[in-house]
């Protein structure tokens, strides 16, 4: 499974959103995610990809998060 699809799946599951709502351009504000929601999503992504996400700064969109995961997974 590609990184985007897995990240999308986690966001849909954790935030109760529809798959179509989660695109690379979607922001966490667009998803009505508060800081606890973002923390939970990041925690699930860390577990799924076996990485540590050092900071949430600069991770404004789903695309930012996907790019970060791809870089850390190398």
Curated annotation (Swiss-Prot):
Phylogenetic lineage: Bacteria, Bacillati, Bacillota, Bacilli, Lactobacillales
Biological process, per Gene Ontology: lipid A biosynthetic process
Gene coding for it: acpP
UniProt PTM comment: 4'-phosphopantetheine is transferred from CoA to a specific serine of apo-ACP by AcpS. This modification is essential for activity because fatty acids are bound in thioester linkage to the sulfhydryl of the prosthetic group.
Cellular localisation: Cytoplasm
Family: Belongs to the acyl carrier protein (ACP) family.
Location (main, coarse): cytoplasm
Keywords: Cytoplasm, Fatty acid biosynthesis, Fatty acid metabolism, Lipid biosynthesis, Lipid metabolism, Phosphopantetheine, Phosphoprotein
Carrier domain: residues covered: 1-73
Residues with O-(pantetheine 4'-phosphoryl)serine modification: 35
Function in brief: Carrier of the growing fatty acid chain in fatty acid biosynthesis.
InterPro entries in the record: ACP (IPR003231), ACP-like_sf (IPR036736), PP-bd_ACP (IPR009081)
Entry's Gene Ontology molecular function annotations: acyl binding; acyl carrier activity
Protein name in UniProt: Acyl carrier protein
This protein's GO CC annotations: cytosol; membrane
UniProt-listed SUPFAM superfamilies: ACP-like
Superkingdom in the source lineage: Bacteria
Pathway: Lipid metabolism; fatty acid biosynthesis
């Amino acid at each position: 499974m590609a990184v985007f699809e897995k990240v999308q799946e986690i966001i849909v599951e954790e935030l109760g959103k529809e798959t179509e709502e989660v695109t690379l351009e979607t922001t966490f504000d667009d998803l009505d995610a508060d800081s606890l929601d973002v923390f939970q999503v990041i925690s699930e992504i860390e577990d799924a990809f076996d990485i540590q996400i050092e900071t949430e700064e600069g991770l404004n969109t789903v695309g930012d998060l996907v790019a970060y995961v791809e870089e850390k997974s190398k």
